[in-house]
A protein has these predicted regions:
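Structural motif of enzymes handling amino- and sulfur-group chemistry
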Residues: 1-78
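FAD-binding core of FAD-dependent oxidoreductases
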Residues: 3, 93-108
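Short Gly/Pro-enriched turn/cap motifs at secondary-structure boundaries
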Residues: 57-59, 89, 93, 121
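A generic structural signal for well-ordered coil/turn residues at beta-strand boundaries
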Residues: 63-65, 98-100, 126-128
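PLP-dependent enzyme catalytic core of the Aspartate aminotransferase-like
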Residues: 74-75, 102-156
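A common structural junction motif
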Residues: 84-98, 149-156
Length: 156
């Protein structure tokens, strides 16, 4: 009964939540790119498959809520995530994707840790790659400022 209740009360708002999820992810991707970060997000014109994405995707939902940023090293990636979680309350380090708050992980040391170095490189996963599933809680401008402070703490 509890699961049925959860589905019945949350499903009607799923479309709105996904639109906000994607809108915020694009804003975060743009802010990181402005800071000089190497960002992977199909909603950015710099993405190699940007045109294909625009051709195939549902325009109402943007490019989704998941992005990746390469900080250049595992040390920087960890500093970035630790700062965002512990100093900014920006989100949580976790290997999951679906949550109302932001979730982040360094794929090379989490979801893909069983791969050797060569396999990671073939898959495009560098030691400094951080995957962010952007949440839709809090004020967007506050979240962008937190993200920028996290970037500066990791790279400055």
């Amino acid at each position: 009964p509890r699961s049925a209740y959860e589905v019945a009360t949350r499903f009607p708002n799923l479309g709105l939540r996904m639109q906000e999820h994607a809108r915020r992810a694009k804003s975060c991707a743009e802010r990181l790119a402005e800071l000089g970060a190497s960002v992977i997000y199909p909603g950015l014109a710099s993405h190699p498959d940007y045109s294909l994405h625009r051709e195939l995707a549902n325009r109402g939902y943007g490019a989704g809520g998941l992005l990746a940023v390469d900080l250049g090293s595992a040390e920087r990636a960890n500093r970035f995530m630790e700062h965002l979680q512990n100093k900014e309350d920006f989100g949580y380090m976790a290997v999951s994707l679906g949550f109302s708050d932001t979730l982040m992980s360094a794929s090379a040391s989490s979801t893909s840790s069983e791969l050797d170095e060569q396999a990671l490189l073939r898959a495009g996963i560098s030691p400094g790659l951080v995957r962010l599933s952007i949440g839709y809680t809090g004020l967007l401008e506050d979240r962008l400022e937190q993200l920028e402070r996290g970037w500066r703490a990791a790279t400055g």
